Amino acid sequence: MDSDLMDFFDFSKQFKRGTALKGCITGDPNALTTESRDSKPIKREKIGTDYVNEIVEKEKQLMNKLVDGQSVAKRNRTLDELDSDDEEENMQEQPSVRSDEAYYEKYRFDLNRNKNLPIYAQREQIMKAIRENPVVILKGETGCGKTTQVPQYILDEACKRREFCNIVVTQPRRIAAISIANRVCQERQWQPGTVCSYQVGLHRQSNVEDTRLLYCTTGVLLNNLIRLKTLTHYTHIVLDEVHERDQDMDFLLIVVRRLLALNSRHVKVILMSATIDTREFSKYFATSSAFPPVVTASHGRKYPLVKYYRDQLKNIHWKDEPQERAPGIGPEGYADAIKILLVIDNMERKAVGQSLQSYEEAKRTGSVLIFLPGINEIDTMADHITSVMEENPTMIITIVRCHSLMSPDSQEEVFQPPLPGHRKIILTTNIAESSITVPDVSYVIDFCLTKVLHTDTATNYSCLRLEWASKVNCRQRAGRVGRLRSGRVYRMVSKAFYLEEMKEFGIPEMLRSPLQNSVLKAKELEMGRPSEILALAMSPPNLSDIQNTVLLLKEVGALYTTVDGVYEELDGDLTYWGTIMSRFPLDVRLSRLIILGYVFNCLEEVIVIAAGMTVRSLYLTGKRRQVNDAFWMHYIFADGSGSDMVAIWRVYRIYLNMCQDRMLKESAEQWARRFNVNLRSLKEMHLMVQELRQRCASVNLQPLPYGTCQMWDDREKSIILKVIIAGAFYPNYFMRSNKSNADYDRSLFQSICGNDPCRTVFFTHYEPRYMGELYTRRIKELFLEVKIPPENMDVTFLHGSEKVFVTFKSDDEDMDTAKVVQVPGRVMTEVYKAVRMRLENQNRPLRVMDQNSALRYVQDRKIGVVTEGTWFPPSNQWNVELLTLPSVFAKNITGLVTYIVSCGKFYFQPRALAESIASMSEIFNGPQQLSCHVRNASAVTKGLQLLAKRGHLFQRAVVLRIETQTNGHPRFRVRFIDYGDMAVLPMDQLRLMPHELKRDFDQLPPRMFECRLALVQPSMVTSSYNRWPKAANDMLISVAQCGRLELEVYSLVNNVAAVLIHMRDGVLNDRLVERQLARRADEDYMSRKDHDLRIRKQEAKRNISVAEQERINEEYLRFAQLPKDMDLEPPPLDKCNLSIRLRGPFSPLESSMNSMLRIGMYKSVTIDKDSVNAVLLDTDPQDRHDQMVVAASVTETDNTERLTARGTTLMPNIHGFGALMAMLFCPTMQIKCNKDRTKYVCLLAGLGFDPETLEPYFAEHDMVINLDVTILRDDIRIINQMRYNIDSMFYNFDANEMPSVGTEDRVVIFNQLRSLLTRLLGKDRSFIERHVSNSEYLWEDMSDLEPPSEPYGKRAIFPMHSSYDLENDNLSNLLELQANCKQLYDWRNFEGNLQTQVCRLCNESLESVAELRLHLLTQLHRDREKQVGYKQQ
């Protein structure tokens, strides 16, 4: 180690960069310091496209047979002769022609076509080429009429000949297929759905038999051809927009070419596009003797278009030459675009005298379209333009943003004419290349950049990369101008770079996107292995990408790991899950979500979630650096679940209810704006939900009929949905970091000086010399932007610290009503809002006075005391001797529970105060004290202390608020100070306190104190939102109704006592655990620290006099009181001559995450900023167990160093939940034991390994989970039973490839799954010490184990897990651990400096006596004591 350190500082030696481990480490990281095979990042070898050559050669031979069966004319010999007219006749037998005379008599056929369309000029040439060639390529510019007219030309010719024809035309988008079909019907005056119709997804117009011209999406035709395995169902197949080269189109080209040569030689194929690469497509469909003919049609431009490149604009002074090799926009790039804007404006001003058009008119039709690669660049460009235009007031502009996430209102702004005298500048992404046409655009500024999504098939991580746009993209962008007048295009690159460096076409989707659906289609095609089919693509993927995709499909259960029982690296037999997945237009993991939803009888919910995950921008996006109030609405929809997917489900349910209530359009739009919902996306999602329901029905996935089994209630559904999500998106698992650090909770409280971390945030960079107590109100006002009222918080300072602490008040006023917004765990909603506020803007300006002025200000107004130049602000003097809080020397207290909110909050009156309370009550109810009736409602204000009727007597109360107005008579909500309960009372049940009474009792602390149950918290299995279940509260109420109770005080923190309630038959806390209404829990650091202090004081009590005990207790209580916010009036702003910047607010609970996958160990992780988990806080800071987050998808940065989790769900804080889910849903796993085989300590999950070499099949996706709770053989048996039942749900998969289990069998299986899952999650698991080793990622040879029974053999998607039997603990080991434990207790009362001790039970080092004492109080150590049989003397 020392030599390594010296080498680091030896600058004569070469410095080597290394990769730091960033993944999920649980336990001692020192165990990983030795380098091993597993400690290095995985780099899988990439295999290119050499495999293609042999397969393509065979396909060419098949294509050459196409010549033998066709009449070939005007064939082109070489690529250079594509336009030649050489003819070659090859007379062969013609196909039989089917007459369709009756059909043409049935419908009206007007054969007069629109001659004004440019395509009409090539009509005869097009038809001649189609008659004489199997494949024709038609290149026609946008707007020439090819999409609507060419199919009609074919239909007209068939009509003339009275021949049968059946034409199908593909469109890449649904809306295009529908609108074009309707347009053709309108043009021909056909009833929609007769001669011409459309099909999108499963939705097809009714009269199928009469349809002769079908417009459909690419996927519809592809699925039909895979099912039919022939083209002969159609006479003509027209593939439109083939240049887009998405995966469906590329795979469709494979299928069409293969079937055309194989069994459909007489079918005609027409390829159409505005920007088609004619050479590539001609080569793809070429035979040995000819190439398909190319017919070109153009429409001619009405107004001229001039293009300029950066190096051609000599009059503009460029500050620097761009680094064109690396795509991107620097500060100078934005400035250069603004220079062009100024040049455009000056040019139009000077042209006024030379043109008939005025300057104002020129601005109206001279809108500027600036193409930028993304939303961040749009915001940056807008900022630059705004700042420059402020210096040029003569140029008045309107900036409009245009991107896919904009609201409908913003979309309308793009098309609206600019205000009089304004020039419209549209900042857009590539959405305006083809989807949007704005007529008044005359100028385009093109940065020639785009963002393209690439997916690493080995990791399944996606990355949005900034790249140079293709020339095709740039030409499409240029085509946006010149609609109303001549146009100009300014490309922000040099002409040489554009011509020589930029690519002609973009990268096809098949080379950069996941291949799962293409591989599944290749399997369904049944014409060879996936690699043999995909090798035939126009741009075949790398073999390693196919291999990785096969591995991913095996992981999700779409493919078996074997082919006919033998492992295949590049192939696997199609499972019934894979067949179902191939029928859904979804990512395979969303399809898996639906399948598991069917298994666990939550089909409707998962269909909605899957539909919502396919729709982009369900929520609207606000502008940068603006706290988007509507963002908080995401949390309302998530309803405390911590799940983006649950939020989607709830949004849809509300929308559906509104639709059923027939809400007016205006009301729906108002609701959508209020809740930040994109109504257009919601409607699109609704259509997808309907389609997915149809697709589920088509593969026999149906919900169980109501009444056939017990349905999930809302509480159960909140857990089962998360179980399904964990199963669907395995292995996108992430674990919160730092929880296992023994020092975690101590540093947590130290950072906020003992405040409650669940209610406290803090600012930094506040210098104490600025006398912060003067500005508490101003600091509170900072939170108004997130709608937190100033009265709901206290602002405090620590002497000498630069931190400002903001503690939010518990919502006592609403504790009997449900909150509008729920957040997970114990943390207050306001903390989430505060942290979200910082994420939008980290620096907060605050106006203050300089120190000398501030000192004069407080002295003049006698605020506090100034001593030797130091200000001491006013403070509350605590009369701690009057507090009713339990003494530090009191262990047990007897008394009454006065009011119960829940097991986590109730109020207790000590028996010792009974006489004084009775005396107070007698005073309050004397005639003289009750004489002050409330005559005027205005006299009752919030916070006023008065007397209010409680039962038959009046008691002290404080006014919370005016509650209701009933018949003009106000009612007031009050809280009884000495009992804790609340009531809503009319004025006649209130009395004002006389002056003398107020003087005597106004400052008297409450005659009760707040309590909560210690060492337990609500069970996540039986409660939601960390609330105590009703059954638990009812148990506490029944105990309290028995009269006097005995409380054992565990600790006192922030004036709240953590207690154990003793009953005749035990302790209530334990009984709640036994009934699964609660679970055992650690107390937090402050509670354990106080408990340790109380134990030591109580042990020493016999040696301390009563008077000394009182003095010590007063000192204890005084020290326990936190600083109070005095809420001083701030100085006037005109006296505040300085501005400082606070940083924050921060929360000590902010968490980071680590990937649990091996491939993600070396990467940092963030959560998508629009997720409900974007503010990820430690919801249960006292709990040291890991809590898991599951992501629907994961993207990575271009440098692959950082991952972003999207569509996240926070899993329930059930101990061991992550390990149990991995065991339940992984393809296979090995659970490993400690060296003595007495307990399971970790599990290795993944796709499995080669039994001969022990090398993993898919090392990147192997996952290690170190166990922190006990997992037993019984748990593995339960999991195996559940895996068997999931497989059984699809047993007897028949020839129709549909699950054929009957309803009765399904009900039996579902009830078994329900029972097993409840058993698995409901166990109270004891804690175990952490284990980490260097061999965790090594698959072990377990051939000595008897293999488990496999009911479905190698046809099981979820094979049975095997595991070693556990041994009993060795007696000598137990004795050693007991001796170690006794030694720790012996050191507990040591007063000197302690040498480092090791707790061998928990594998933790203890550096001090204080640390040792607190460790002995942890749940982990107490559980370990029980496990080793140690009993404290």
From Swiss-Prot:
Disulfide-linked positions: none
Taxonomic classification: Eukaryota, Metazoa, Ecdysozoa, Arthropoda, Hexapoda
Enzyme Commission number: 3.6.4.13
SMART domains: DEXDc, HA2, HELICc, TUDOR
Protein name: Probable ATP-dependent RNA helicase spindle-E
Species of provenance: Drosophila virilis
Alphabetical GO biological process terms: dorsal appendage formation; germarium-derived oocyte fate determination; global gene silencing by mRNA cleavage; heterochromatin formation; intracellular mRNA localization; mitotic chromosome condensation; oocyte karyosome formation; oocyte localization involved in germarium-derived egg chamber formation
Location of the protein in the cell: Cytoplasm
Main localization (coarse): cytoplasm
Chain's gene name: spn-E
Taxonomy, superkingdom: Eukaryota
